[in-house]
Amino acid sequence: MYDYGLSVLSHYGLTASGTMRVRGALLCHTEQGDKLISEFGTAAEKLEQRYLLQCRITESGLLRCDQILRNEEGALATRGDDGGTYIVRNWYPGRECETGNSEDLIRASDALARLHTAAHLPVKMEYRRESLVEECIRHNVEIRKIRKYLQTKKKKNEFEKLLLASAGPYLEQGERAAAEMKASSYEKLRQRADEEGAVCHGEFSQHNILLENGRGE
C-alpha cells in the first residue's frame, strides 16, 4: 500500500495524530507541530545546500521557512516502507497569499525583502552562473551562426524563411541589451552580490507564501 511517505516519521521520532494530502505532499500533525512529507527528487549535494540555506534563513530570525529536518541518523532524506525516498520539513498554519488583495501583496513584498536579507551563503563556484552580459553575448553569437547558415542555404522551407527574417531584429535587440547592460551598474551589483554571498532563489509565487497573524512567512 502506498503510504505517501508516512512511514518515514518513525525515523524522526515523530508520530502523526492526523494527516492530509496537500499539493504534492502529505501534511502531518505531530507532537512537535505540523510537518510536511514530500518525495525527494534532487541531487544530494543540492539538498545539502538547500538545508544550509534554510538554516541561515531560520537563524536570521527574519522569517520562517519550510526547514528540512535531519532524521535520527543525521540524513536529510529517508527511504519509506513503500520504497520511495522522502524529505520531512517544518510547516506552519496559514493561508496562501491572494494576488487580488493589495494588503497581502504588501506583506508578500515585505517577506521577499526579508528573504533577500537573510539568504546568503559562502560562494561555491559550481553554483555561480555566468553574468547576464556573457549570456546575452553568447546568445547573440548563436543567432549570428544560425543566420549565416540560413543565408547560405539555397533551399529553405517556410519556417526557415520566417526564422531568417526574424534573426536580424532579434540580433539587434540582443546587441542593444548587451550594450546597455555593459554601460549600466550591473557588473558592480553582481560583484557586490558575489562578495556578500547573495543567493538567487527560485519562483516566488503566491503558492509559496503563507500568511499568518498578518505577517508573510
PLM features per residue range, with description:
Residues 33-126:
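ATP-binding pocket architecture of kinase catalytic cores
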Residues 197, 202-207:
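Residue immediately N-terminal to the catalytic "proton-acceptor" Asp
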Residues 199, 210-217:
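Active-site Asp-x-Gly
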Residues 2-32, 71:
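ATP-binding glycine-rich phosphate-binding loop
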Residues 1-5, 16, 54, 58-60, ...:
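Gram-positive cell-envelope targeting signals
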